[in-house]
A protein has these predicted regions:
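Membrane-embedded alpha-helical bundles that constitute the cytochrome b-like, heme-associated redox core
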Residues: 1-232
């Protein structure tokens, strides 16, 4: 009797399909934008600018969701309603989708002949001639997010301490994206943008403080328990 063949590690998984799809769509969009921009077909059109703004907003919301989901997972708060494996899947999905939309957000500007963002100005921090510091906040946030996505596949090779330290970068990425969108977004002064900014920042601050205080409380209990076990 033949034994059933176990799936190999190289087989497709939902996560790899998602990553491949997002990367493919992003690259195709970038190429399409470059083609329209260089041929002059879209000259005078503001479509690229609107697409960039919309996708940037979606990327920010997805990144926020990823950070919140990660905090719910690390603090144990979300385990009351959702099982940890599902929380982790949602966290990874939101992170990957955020990178896809953020890449689209930058690459689509290559087709806008009015703004004129070459590839180097999009992918290299501080290389932009337009607001280099604020643009770099978004670029660094994207690179950090890509690093975190890569860490999902390397988790088995990392220690718990290294994994936690690496994921502190997610907070840096979120707040840099927050500053990038708030400072450069043309809608930042509107009421709805203010509501979104405060509505996304507040949960991250609250859950971050909850995590810090919970960690300190657990550490104090462990230290206190160890002290009581010491012989007199």
């Amino acid at each position: 009797m033949h034994r059933p063949i176990a799936p190999e590690r190289g087989d497709l998984t939902p996560g790899s399909v998602l990553v491949s799809t997002i990367v493919g769509i992003t690259l195709a969009t970038g190429g399409f934008a470059i083609g329209l921009g260089t041929t002059g077909i879209a000259e005078g059109s503001t479509s690229f600018w609107y697409l960039s703004r919309a996708s940037g907003f979606v990327a920010y919301v997805l990144l926020w969701g990823s950070v919140v989901w990660g905090l719910l997972l690390s603090t144990g708060t979300g385990r009351r309603w959702v099982r940890p494996p599902q929380l982790l899947d949602a966290h990874q999905f939101l992170s990957t989708a955020a990178v896809g939309f953020a890449s689209f957000h930058g690459l689509v500007l290559m087709g806008d002949r009015y703004v004129s963002f070459p590839l180097r100005a999009i992918v290299v921090p501080f290389a932009s001639s337009y607001e280099p510091l604020l643009v770099a906040c978004g670029q660094i946030a994207l690179w950090l997010s890509m690093l975190l996505i890569g860490s999902f596949h390397l988790r088995r090779h990392l220690s718990g301490q290294a994994w936690r330290r690496l994921h502190y970068a997610s907070f840096v990425a979120f707040w840099m994206a927050f500053v990038h969108g708030l400072a450069l977004g043309s809608e930042s002064a509107t009421l709805w943008a203010t509501v979104v900014s405060l509505g996304t920042a507040a949960p991250v601050i609250f859950l971050s403080l909850h995590r810090v205080f919970s960690t300190q409380r657990i550490h104090g209990l462990l230290v206190g328990g160890a002290a009581t076990r010491q012989p007199a």
